[in-house]
């Protein structure tokens, strides 16, 4: 019985197969012998073998990192001029502590006779200033790197700053109006001053936080926040409804109890 098998490949395809079978990679050279009987053996030059046997990294150096020119310049300046680098850190720390000290002095000086003023001034001088000095002086490189990354990130998001500046004053005006209503309702001058001080402090901190959040992610403090709260409430309602309408397994299979 004759075999009537006819190949579907064209002569050009067969010629290409012959070329690729006997083709030698000039960069890799001849392929070494491959023993398929060995367990875990993979063909040479295989992508799977490269993934299974990665090139070991030098434990002393670790993975290669991309060199940052700013870090290199800072380290070079630190190594070449250690005294100047030390004085620079000391000067920045003293300036920051001086600004905090004089700000506390100006704000607390009218209340120096009261107990609140004495406590606030002593806490500022005894706790805040030393902590600030230690943080700036000993962690100089850490916070400078963090500030540099933050400035670069804000420069990338500069288009969002206009809407952020619009939202922050609106929030401050609403808060200030509420503070005036509360002060006039209480009527006491002392409570009115406390409400004003707390409102302005909260307004300053909230404005900074809103500016940062809105610059990084537009709408995170307004529209997106409302949507997230609404989605969370819907999810809780669905969970509550499903828990009330769920049928226990015993009622579904009464035969199992018997």
UniProtKB/Swiss-Prot annotation:
It is a multi-pass membrane protein. Keywords: Membrane, Transmembrane, Transmembrane helix, Vacuole. One of its GO terms (cellular component) is cytoplasm. Its main location: membrane. InterPro entries: WTF. The keyword Transmembrane applies. Belongs to the WTF family. It comes from the Eukaryota. GO terms for biological process: meiotic drive. It is found in: Spore membrane; Vacuole membrane. Acts as a suppressor component of the dual wtf meiotic drive system, and can suppress but not confer meiotic drive by compatible poisons. Wtf meiotic drive systems promote unequal transmission of alleles from the parental zygote to progeny spores by encoding a poison and an antidote from the same locus; the poison is trans-acting and forms toxic aggregates in all spores within an ascus, wherease the antidote is spore-specific and targets aggregates for degradation by the vacuole. Residues 19-30 have a biased composition (Basic and acidic residues). This is Meiotic drive suppressor wtf20.
């Amino acid at each position: 019985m004759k075999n009537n098998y006819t190949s579907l490949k064209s002569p050009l395809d067969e010629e290409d197969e012959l070329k690729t079978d006997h083709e030698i990679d000039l960069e890799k050279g001849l392929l070494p012998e491959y023993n398929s009987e060995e367990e875990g053996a993979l063909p040479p030059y295989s992508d799977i073998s490269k993934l299974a046997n990665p090139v070991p990294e030098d434990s002393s150096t670790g993975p290669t990192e991309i060199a940052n020119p700013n870090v290199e310049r800072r380290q070079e300046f630190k190594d070449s001029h250690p005294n100047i680098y030390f004085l620079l850190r000391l000067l920045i720390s003293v300036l920051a502590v001086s600004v905090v000290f004089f700000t506390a002095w100006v704000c607390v000086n009218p209340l120096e006779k009261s107990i609140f003023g004495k406590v606030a001034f002593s806490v500022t001088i005894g706790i805040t200033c030393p902590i600030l000095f230690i943080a700036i002086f000993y962690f100089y490189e850490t916070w400078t790197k963090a500030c540099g990354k933050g400035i670069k990130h804000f420069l990338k998001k500069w288009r969002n700053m206009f809407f952020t500046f619009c939202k922050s004053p609106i929030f401050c005006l609403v808060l200030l109006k509420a503070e005036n209503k509360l002060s006039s309702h209480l009527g006491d001058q002392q409570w009115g001053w406390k409400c004003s001080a707390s409102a302005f402090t909260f307004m300053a901190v909230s404005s900074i936080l809103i500016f940062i959040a809105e610059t990084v992610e537009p709408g995170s403090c307004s529209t997106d926040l409302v949507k997230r709260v609404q989605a969370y409430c819907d999810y809780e309602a669905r969970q509550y409804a499903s828990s009330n309408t769920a049928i226990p397994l015993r009622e579904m299979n009464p035969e199992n109890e018997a």
